[in-house]
Amino acid sequence: MNFVFLWAALGGAIGSSLRYFVGKMMPSKFLMFESFPLGTFSVNIIGCFVIGFMGHLAVKKVFGDDFGIFFVTGVLGGFTTFSSYGLDTLKLLQKSQYIEAVSYALGTNILGLTGVAIGWFLAKNFVGIH
C-alpha cells in the first residue's frame, strides 16, 4: 500500500496545528502598528526559511521521498503555502527565468489579493452576510 497521501495528511495536520499555535502566541501590536498580523507574518517568514533549507537538502538527497512529502508537502504545506510560493519563485530565478519569476511573484500577489477582495465582496453582497 502506498502511504504517500497518509504522510502528506499527517504532516498537514501537524503544520496546521503549528500555524494555529504560532498565531495565538503572537501579539497583535507590533512595533508602531496597533493591529498587525504578526502570527501570519511570522509563519510565512519561518516557513520560507525552512522550505529553503529543506529544499536544498532534498535536492542533495539527504532524506528520502517519503520524508520530503511528509515534511515539505505536509508540514510546511499545512504551516504555510507561502513557503511553496517562495521556493517556486527561487527555482525560476535559479534557472534564469526572470520574466517568469517576476510574473509569478507579481501575479500571485495581485491576483491573490484580488481573489480575496472579490470573494469578500460576493459574500457580503450576494450571500447576505454583512
Swiss-Prot record:
Going by the entry's taxonomy, the superkingdom of the source organism is recorded as Bacteria
Gene Ontology BP term (one): cellular detoxification of fluoride
Q: How is this protein's activity kept under control?
A: Na(+) is not transported, but it plays an essential structural role and its presence is essential for fluoride channel function.
Disulfides per UniProt? none
Query: What are the record keywords, sorted?
Result: Cell inner membrane, Cell membrane, Ion channel, Ion transport, Membrane, Metal-binding, Sodium, Transmembrane, Transmembrane helix, Transport
> Which residues participate in Na(+) binding?
77, 80
The membrane topology of this protein is: Multi-pass membrane protein
Where does the record place it? Cell inner membrane
Q: Name one GO cellular component term.
A: plasma membrane
Q: Does the keyword Cell membrane apply?
A: yes
Q: Which residues span the membrane?
A: 3-23, 39-59, 67-87, 102-122
NCBIfam families reported in the protein's UniProt record: crcB
Described by its record, this protein's role is as follows:
Fluoride-specific ion channel. Important for reducing fluoride concentration in the cell, thus reducing its toxicity.
Q: What is this protein called?
A: Fluoride-specific ion channel FluC
Taxonomy, top ranks, is: Bacteria, Pseudomonadati, Campylobacterota, Epsilonproteobacteria, Campylobacterales
